[in-house]
Amino acid sequence: MKPTHARYWVVVLALALAMIMYIQRVAISQAIVPIAIDLHLNKEQTGLVLGAFGLSYALFEIPMGLLGDKLGVRWVLSQLVLIWSLFTALTGAAWNLASMWVVRFLFGAGEAGCFPNLTRMLSAWLPLSERVRAQAVMWAFGRWGGALAPPVAFFVIYHFGWRLGFVALAMLGVAWVAFFLPWFRNDPAEHKSVNAAELEMLESSRKLVLHATAVDLRALAI
């Protein structure tokens, strides 16, 4: 029996989300000029707005990853994408420096959990021989999302304005969750599209990793 290829759909989901998160992340760089004009922000205040994301991302990346370990990727990642998409939309509702800073800070807190949870998802769904390649492609798609963000954001802002533009960009995350949540399972064994051969491939790889880890620990104990 040949293995099924359900795991490749997991990779596609990871690649799509990596691209979406970078589009939503970088879009503010294209909107910052009209934002600064409408909210009467000077250069220092604009810097505070742009820096809010980086601060929260650094603070929450590890906790959000641990949350995925404890509660499972399916639920945690779905909630995180909805949370950061909500704050993407709420970017368009900000009315002053404080509100914009809070919104961007909370947006960063949501996005901070993306790559830790995607990494866990790929480790559960891919054999060891495919993980490094999938991780590399996922990071590349993220950067392509960053490259696509300027023209996409410019198009959206030009046609809808920056406020409605962020609402439109938020819909990308909502659409992703609408497909991911009903389809994905934390354990490949629980997925109806995974046959016995594909499951055996994944289980064998998992046992190999556990064996190698045990050998390393015994070596350290000597």
For each of these PLM feature ranges, what is it?
Residues 59-98:
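Conserved MFS/SLC helix-loop-helix module at the cytosolic interface between two early adjacent transmembrane helices
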Residues 138, 142-184, 188-191:
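Helix-loop-helix hairpin linking two adjacent transmembrane segments in secondary transporters
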Residues 103-142:
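Cytoplasmic helix-loop-helix junction between adjacent transmembrane helices
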Residues 9-43, 64:
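Extracytoplasmic
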Residues 40, 72, 93-99, 110, ...:
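Helix-breaking motifs and short loop linkers at transmembrane-helix boundaries and internal kinks
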Residues 26, 54-62, 112, 146-147:
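Residue-level signature of mid-helix packing/kink "hotspots" within the transmembrane helices
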Residues 1-3, 187-222:
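Juxtamembrane intracellular "pre-TM" segments in multi-pass secondary transporters
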Residues 18, 50, 54, 81, ...:
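Small-residue-rich transmembrane alpha-helices and their cytosolic helix-loop interfaces
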